[in-house]
């Protein structure tokens, strides 16, 4: 379970003279920084459910060309199991391999700078959910400090309004 994994990580950090926070900063220094955020758009009632279906259909048939000024270079549709990637100016389709051919009503968009936006309707509530993974450029290998964490977090959060506007939210 997740608690066992975090205990293993904490033990590793302690054995190496670090706190969990120190270890997280080391991970950012090695792999770069990324901020995740979720936006929920609630649409109650029967008309809300219809709006959510229409939104998903629109995103599926009219994929954004850019998000927050960044060109979309790859899309994944886990309902149709089709991935489209922009290669040399042409969109190339290929199948998404899923265990047992399972599908899900999820769409993902990837930009040229590594931003990822995922969208799916909630299975239990009258809402559509948007998940954003926002990378922030760092100098790989350079020590990453608490001040770097604060700066990168603020930079990523500052991009959220433009991302939302690009998706019509």
PLM regions and their residue ranges:
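A generic beta-sheet turn/junction motif
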Residues: 123-125
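Phosphate-binding and adjacent anionic-ligand microenvironments
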Residues: 1-120, 138-143, 149-169
């Amino acid at each position: 379970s997740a608690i066992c994994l975090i205990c293993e990580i904490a033990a590793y950090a302690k054995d190496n003279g670090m706190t969990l926070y120190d270890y997280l900063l080391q991970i950012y220094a090695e792999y770069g920084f990324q901020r995740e955020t979720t936006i929920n758009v609630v649409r109650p009632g029967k008309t809300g459910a219809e709006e959510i279906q229409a939104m998903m259909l629109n995103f599926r048939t009219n994929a954004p060309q850019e998000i927050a000024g960044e060109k979309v270079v790859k899309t994944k549709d886990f309902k149709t199991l089709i991935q489209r990637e922009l290669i040399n100016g042409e969109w190339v389709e290929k199948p998404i391999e899923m265990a047992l051919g399972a599908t899900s009503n999820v769409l993902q968009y990837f930009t040229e700078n590594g931003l990822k936006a995922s969208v799916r309707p909630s299975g239990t509530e009258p809402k559509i959910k948007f998940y954003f993974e926002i990378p922030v450029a760092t100098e790989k290998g350079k020590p990453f400090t608490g001040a770097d964490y604060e700066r990168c977090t603020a930079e990523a959060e500052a991009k959220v309004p433009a991302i939302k506007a690009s998706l019509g939210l």
